[in-house]
Structures are given as structure tokens and as C-alpha cells.
């Protein structure tokens, strides 16, 4: 089936995008981002600037697959660190409470999230918990402010892009509601995006997170908040996903 647009329709679309692009837009993201094959090994020293003792937030599966590799990098940056590997694919307030308890018990002063979007989201929520005893549900619909512990995000999948966003989603186990928490303080200070870390990712996860990334790219391009900067990133992402996801899968 072929879909054609009339000249008038194309003109309307162009004019609408022009109006949107003349509006004042804001672009915020993580302060420092290292990307590329082997980025973690080459730039792991940057982690030492986070603090003295981090809590590593991850999943049991991720830590089992690459814990030895990650431990080598962490030991080169810190004299001690703690690990919370209780996060699964749907982080809940109960998991966040467990992570917060580990943070406090071990005297941690910063956070490192390693894994897919779930551990990175959980890291952000734990950071919020370190500054207040208020339940996470009380932050829904509000802009979170204040100073949080330093955070570094090390994604192992292409899915959510949580390492560069000011959002996190945590499930409230009492109401079964997915809570959206937001605030620029939730942006990590550091992101290390190392493609080599995705080599051991299961095939099904590679496919699912790749399509998730494609969805986010399309959403960004069609958003009313789109701007030339985000358009360039979105188009580049779509092209790369179509080129490389089939090969990676």
C-alpha cells in the first residue's frame, strides 16, 4: 500500500514543525558521557570522582555475568564498595528500600548503577531515599529538588536511556501503580556507555531493548518538544538501529 500526501498536507506539516521549532526549548542531559567500545576500561578512573565508597546497584543476572570484570574496574577506583543485586526487570519500592538499607548499613556516599534501565532507575530512587524518609509515592507529580549523592550510570542494554534522563519509574507494591519520579537532580553526573558490556546480553533481551530504543527514537522525533538537536539524535538512532540490530540479534 502506498500512502501519498498532498502538497497542502505537506505544507501544513512543515508549517507546524516550524512553529514548534521557534518555541523556546530546553535540552538537559548527563554532565559527562563516555561512549565507545571499551569505554569502561579506558575511563573507569572517572568513577573515583564520585565519592569514597559507592553502592553498586544492579541485577543478580548482570552481576553473575560480568561481576568479575566490573569488580576489577571498581577495585582500581575505590578501596571498598558494596553491591545491591536485588533489582529485577520491574523495580519496586520494596527493592528500593532494600537498596537504601544497604547504602546506609555500609556507609556509602555515592551510587553506581550497572545493567539495563531497571537498575539505573533503581539507583536514582535510592538516591532520593538517602535525603528523606518520605515515601516515594509522595514525590509523584512533583519536581524533585535538593542535593543527592553523586551517581554514575553504566548501561548494558540499549533500552530506556535512563543514563541520560531526569526520570525514573518505580512500582508501588501497595497500589500496583508505576510511579513516575522526575527532577534534574536525577540526572547522573557520569554515564559510561560501553558497547562491549552488551556482548553477554541474552539474545531476547538484545531484541527487546533494541526495539525499545527504536520506539524512544520515534517518540522523540514526533514529540511536540522536538528541536533540531533532538531530531538529529533521533534520526541517527533510527538509522543505526535498522543497520545494526539485525546483525546484533
What are these regions (language model features)?
Residues 112-124, 157-160:
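FAD-binding core of FAD-dependent oxidoreductases
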Amino acid at each position: 500500500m502506498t500512502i501519498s500526501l498532498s502538497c497542502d498536507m505537506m505544507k501544513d506539516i512543515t508549517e507546524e514543525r516550524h512553529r514548534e521549532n521557534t518555541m523556546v526549548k530546553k535540552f538537559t542531559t548527563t554532565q559527562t558521557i563516555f561512549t565507545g567500545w571499551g569505554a569502561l576500561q579506558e575511563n573507569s578512573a572517572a568513577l573515583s570522582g564520585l565519592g569514597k565508597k559507592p553502592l553498586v546497584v544492579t541485577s543478580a543476572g548482570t552481576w553473575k555475568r560480568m561481576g568479575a570484570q566490573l569488580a576489577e574496574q571498581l577495585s582500581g577506583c575505590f578501596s571498598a564498595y558494596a553491591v545491591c543485586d536485588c533489582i529485577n526487570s520491574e523495580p519496586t519500592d520494596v527493592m528500593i528500600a532494600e537498596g537504601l538499607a544497604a547504602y546506609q548499613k555500609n556507609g556509602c556516599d555515592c551510587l553506581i548503577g550497572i545493567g539495563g534501565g531497571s537498575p539505573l532507575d533503581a539507583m536514582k530512587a535510592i538516591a532520593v531515599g538517602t535525603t528523606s524518609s518520605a515515601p516515594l509515592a509522595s514525590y509523584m507529580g512533583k519536581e524533585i529538588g535538593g542535593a543527592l549523592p553523586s551517581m554514575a550510570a553504566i548501561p548494558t542494554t540499549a533500552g530506556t536511556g535512563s543514563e541520560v534522563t531526569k526520570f525514573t519509574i518505580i512500582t508501588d507494591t501497595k497500589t500496583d501503580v508505576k510511579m513516575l519520579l522526575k527532577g534534574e537532580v536525577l540526572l547522573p553526573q557520569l554515564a559510561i556507555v560501553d558497547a562491549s558490556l552488551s556482548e553477554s546480553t541474552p539474545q531476547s533481551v538484545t531484541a527487546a531493548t533494541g526495539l525499545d530504543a527504536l520506539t524512544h527514537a520515534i517518540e522523540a522525533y514526533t514529540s511536540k518538544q522536538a528541536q533540531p538537536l533532538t531530531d538529529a539524535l533521533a534520526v541517527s538512532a533510527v538509522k543505526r538501529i535498522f543497520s545494526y540490530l539485525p546483525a546484533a540479534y
